[in-house]
């Protein structure tokens, strides 16, 4: 009986958590909006619970072709897994305000990656603060059989290398220049690097879009210049 009651409590907890995470999402026509900066969210950051929500909303709404992101970051591991989910759905990604830290991994999953005028993409290397590490060690030391903090440190080293390798792979798969990828990992977690639009497009982070896709072709002014075939990906 106690086991059954515990099972019911776990189901209720998971349902409430999922519902709370769903508050980050809204749908308008063909666009799924993901916003971790809303007020009163249970977890106002990119979290592992969001993986299920992304999968659910995209499966239930096959008309969605764009995902609009607004987030200052969160769990690097969650962002990497959401990248994998979005990659399956062949959607475009859009940023109209800011997408930073772990959110970048989600943005790079876009088939086409739009950056609105004035919007920001922020980069820094992933980090794990001391308080969270202490909590993780206390919660999982028996399960993982860590006899002391030295064994835990060895595990952290391996996990850090794994996360870094996944970031490199995602950036490479998305067509991002290796030089920029390396530069992002040089930025301390307490800082944030916001590259210029030119830097982002040159490095393959933001897509180059044919003019006809964005707005009608205008008659070129007589400046002795040829009309460009491509322009920076901007949405007005």
For the regions a language model picked out, list residue spans one by one.
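Catalytic-histidine neighborhood of serine endopeptidases
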Residues: 124
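Small-residue (G/S/T/A) turn/hinge positions that recur once per unit in extracellular repeat modules
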Residues: 110, 119-121
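Glycine-rich beta-to-alpha transition loops that act as phosphate-gripper elements at the mouths
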Residues: 95-99
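N-terminal organellar transit peptides
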Residues: 19-94, 114-116, 127-236
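Sec-dependent N-terminal signal peptides
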Residues: 4-13
């Amino acid at each position: 009986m106690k086991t059954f009651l515990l099972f019911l409590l776990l189901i209720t907890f998971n349902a409430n958590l999922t519902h709370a995470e769903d508050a980050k999402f809204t749908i308008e026509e063909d666009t799924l909006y993901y916003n971790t900066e809303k007020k009163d969210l249970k977890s106002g950051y990119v979290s592992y619970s969001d993986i299920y929500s992304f999968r659910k909303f995209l499966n239930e709404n096959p008309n969605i072709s764009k995902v609009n992101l607004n987030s200052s970051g969160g769990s690097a591991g969650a962002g990497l897994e959401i990248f994998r989910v979005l990659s399956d759905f062949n959607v475009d990604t859009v940023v109209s305000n800011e997408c930073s830290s772990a959110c970048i991994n989600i943005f790079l999953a876009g088939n086409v990656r739009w950056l609105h005028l004035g919007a920001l993409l922020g980069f820094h290397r992933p980090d794990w603060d001391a308080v969270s590490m202490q909590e993780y060690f206390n919660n999982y030391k028996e399960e993982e059989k860590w006899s002391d903090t030295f064994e835990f440190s060895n595990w952290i080293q391996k996990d850090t290398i794994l996360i870094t390798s996944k970031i490199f792979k995602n950036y490479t798969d998305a067509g991002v220049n290796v030089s920029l990828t390396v530069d992002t990992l040089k930025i301390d977690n307490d800082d944030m690097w916001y590259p210029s639009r030119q830097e982002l497009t040159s490095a393959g982070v933001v897509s180059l879009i044919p003019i006809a896709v964005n707005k009608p072709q205008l008659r070129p002014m007589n400046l002795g210049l040829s009309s460009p075939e491509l322009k920076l990906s901007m949405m007005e």
